[in-house]
Amino acid sequence: ERLEALIAIEHDDHATAAAIRAADPPPWLRIIPAPPGGPRTKPRAMNHALDLARGEIVGIYDAEDRPDPGQIRRAAAIFAKAPPRLACLQARLAFHNTADGWLPRCFAIEYIQWFHLVLPAMRRMGFPIPLGGTSLFFRRRALERLGAWDAWNVTEDADLGLRLARAGYETGLVDSDTQEEAVSRPLAWIRQRSRWQKGYLHTWMTHMRRPVRLWRGLG
């Protein structure tokens, strides 16, 4: 096996590190604490982990994700047959806790239409794919060429999807599902969506600084 798994955590998250070690992880799994400093964000932690990763294909999962068992092999097989311009693959996201109430069920309906209808249509029409933040696979060379993730953007996935398209890369879709846990409380939903809107605004302001260049880059 050529699998390597890096768990990116903050440098002072001792409880998570202890829980992982107590679970007796396999030798191909390593804990990667982000160095002290800011911002304390997921993209900053991923940038640090990328520097220590050894693989040519880089996959991203959130801590609660439950991907299909064959998802990684399927993504690797697609990359092996595809031209280098295919730099990213997005798997579908779904939720395993729809029985927890009305809000998770609404999430599930939203994601079904997004991953089964909207993204495939955008792919067919040649539009940039707004990435989902998890269950993503990248060619490492393309990721490093673009400078990896923007550590200050809380929707680093949306920003990276646009940067991939502007650089001439393509994003494909993997016929595979990852089960996630949807937020089930209204306040948590408000915080999550507020963070997303903040990140989308950040992304829009970043890429619209030179709208003509953006238009030309996206073709």
Locate predicted features.
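Catalytic donor-sugar/metal-binding loop of nucleotide-sugar-dependent glycosyltransferases
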Residues: 161-179
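Short aromatic/hydrophobic "clamp" motif used to bind/position activated sugar donors
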Residues: 58
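Hydrophobic targeting segments
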Residues: 1-9, 31
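A short, conserved beta-strand element in the Rossmann-like catalytic core
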Residues: 66-67, 94-96, 159, 179-180
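Acidic donor-binding loop at a coil-to-helix junction in glycosyltransferase catalytic cores
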Residues: 154-160
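A conserved acidic beta->alpha catalytic loop
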Residues: 9-18, 36-39, 66
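Acidic metal-phosphate-binding loop of nucleotide-sugar-dependent transferases
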Residues: 13, 61, 65-67, 93
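Long helical/loop segments within the catalytic core of UDP-sugar-dependent glycosyltransferases
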Residues: 22-55, 69-154, 186, 190, ...
